[in-house]
């Protein structure tokens, strides 16, 4: 199979039929075999009923229904596990992404041998102050921290080699950082393609300005996880050991100083009256706790790699 098209959605009943019709026309015109995965992330409208009706008419459609709203990352994770296409394309269900871009994205992955092709909505039809400006700041920070030079990390329209999505774990709110996760996994042939953007024809946006705050926090998390996530003991153990050693040496110096004073006949100064005593004690205690945190982190990672943090009601 050439393509798996993955579409997370939340309350998008008005756009689903039009979206699939455009996808179907594009793939048939380009002679591409394909499947579509709709992931209903806790919709409260008729989205799932529409997906079921489309499935009856078009066997290449598949659907995953979450028991509640878990988020875009969990939706992508659930679909990535089930895709069969050589190239996986993700896109939003709100018709702001153009299905007509699919053939060229597919060609760039197959013929140009890119691991990831990310869409770049250079000209956006969003509110300047609440979306465009924060998005530019966010993307600039993401490029600087991650070392992956994309203009639009938030663009939902992306194409991946099958090996990429099968090799990474998308969790939390990390969907916007899939290219960074992929680069950390060794898939470094990443490029971008300028794609058109249009105002949302139906419904309202499900994202507010708070997503950028979460995005920056996720960026810090990603920086840490990419370096120490697989082996937290490398970070916590090293910092904890260093703090313990500094605290121990400080306490040792205080003890030696006290013995020297006693040898000289100087009495009356208790070690506990010296603030360095409490500093040394605190550093030794914190060092021990950090070391234990690193050990517990190792154990948690080893026992929870396969844990899914979402519940699926139905798969069709």
Where are these regions (language model features)?
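Hydrophobic helical membrane-anchoring modules
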Residues: 180-316
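Acceptor/aglycone-binding surface of glycosyltransferases and processive sugar-polymer synthases
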Residues: 62-68, 72-82, 87, 99-177, ...
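Cell-envelope/extracellular polymer assembly enzymes that use nucleotide-activated donors
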Residues: 2-4, 35
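Donor nucleotide-sugar binding loop of glycosyltransferases
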Residues: 12-15, 43, 98, 273
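Short, well-formed alpha-helical segments that are part of the catalytic scaffolds
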Residues: 12-27
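Short beta-strand/loop segment that forms part of the nucleotide-sugar
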Residues: 32-42, 64-65
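A conserved acidic beta->alpha catalytic loop
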Residues: 40-49, 95-96
């Amino acid at each position: 199979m050439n393509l798996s098209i993955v579409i997370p959605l939340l309350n998008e009943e008005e756009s689903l039929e039009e979206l699939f019709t455009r996808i179907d026309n594009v793939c048939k015109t380009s002679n591409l075999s394909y499947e579509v995965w709709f992931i209903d992330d806790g919709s409260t409208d008729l989205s799932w009923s529409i997906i079921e009706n489309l499935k009856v008419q078009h066997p290449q459609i598949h659907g995953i229904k979450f028991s509640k709203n878990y988020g875009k990352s969990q939706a992508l994770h659930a679909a990535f596990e089930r895709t069969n296409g050589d190239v996986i394309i993700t896109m939003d269900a709100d018709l702001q992404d153009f299905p007509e871009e699919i053939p060229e994205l597919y060609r760039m992955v197959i013929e140009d041998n890119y691991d990831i092709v990310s869409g770049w909505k250079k000209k956006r039809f969003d509110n300047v102050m609440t979306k465009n400006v924060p998005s530019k700041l966010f993307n600039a920070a993401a490029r600087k921290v991650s070392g992956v030079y994309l203009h639009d990390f938030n663009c939902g329209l992306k194409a991946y080699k099958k090996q990429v999505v099968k090799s990474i774990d998308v969790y939390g709110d990390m969907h916007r950082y899939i290219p960074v996760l992929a680069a950390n996994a060794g898939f470094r042939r990443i490029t971008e393609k300028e794609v058109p953007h249009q105002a949302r024809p139906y419904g309202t946006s499900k994202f507010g300005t708070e997503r950028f705050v979460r995005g920056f926090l996720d960026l810090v998390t990603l920086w840490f996880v990419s370096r120490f996530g697989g082996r937290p003991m490398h970070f916590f153990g090293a910092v904890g050991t260093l703090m313990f050693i500094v605290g121990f040496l400080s306490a040792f110096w205080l003890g030696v100083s006290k013995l020297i004073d006693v040898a000289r006949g100087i009495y009356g100064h208790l070690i506990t009256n010296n603030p360095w005593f409490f500093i040394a004690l605190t550093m030794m205690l914190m060092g021990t706790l950090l070391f234990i945190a690193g050990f517990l982190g190792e154990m948690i990672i080893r026992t929870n790699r396969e844990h899914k943090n979402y519940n699926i009601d139905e798969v069709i």
